[in-house]
Regions:
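Charge-dense, helix-prone N-terminal extensions
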Residues: 1-108
Length: 108
């Protein structure tokens, strides 16, 4: 089942206090980025955040789930209505994740 665009926009709005939130559509679901760092997935109208130690400390409830068959476990976020909670979770998670690699210029 693909994500509802209204739900995706709701998640973007709810997480916006953490930084610049962007999403990229991939096969009906979305990768979620904060300030250019991939922090989670939006799949089947659910939010999943990458597992990190600092993120685990902030979580109200630790639920590990795979967003789709064959994927690593992510933190499943059941409370997407608490904007302050989501902001704190993402702000704690981002520094623990690898920064995106600079794109190389193709050789001519």
């Amino acid at each position: 089942m693909a994500c509802n665009p209204d739900f995706v926009q709701y998640i973007i709005d709810q997480c916006s206090g953490a930084g610049e939130i962007a999403v990229k559509k991939m096969m009906g679901d979305y990768c979620a980025y904060c300030d250019g760092v991939l922090f989670g997935l939006i799949c089947d109208n659910n939010l999943y955040v990458k597992v990190t130690g600092p993120g685990r400390v902030v979580l109200k409830e630790v639920i590990l789930r795979s967003p789709y068959d064959g994927a690593k476990d992510y933190f499943y976020i059941s409370d997407v209505d608490d904007r302050e909670y989501l902001t704190a979770l993402i702000k704690a998670t981002i520094p623990a994740l690898p920064k995106p690699k600079a794109k190389k210029n193709p050789m001519k």
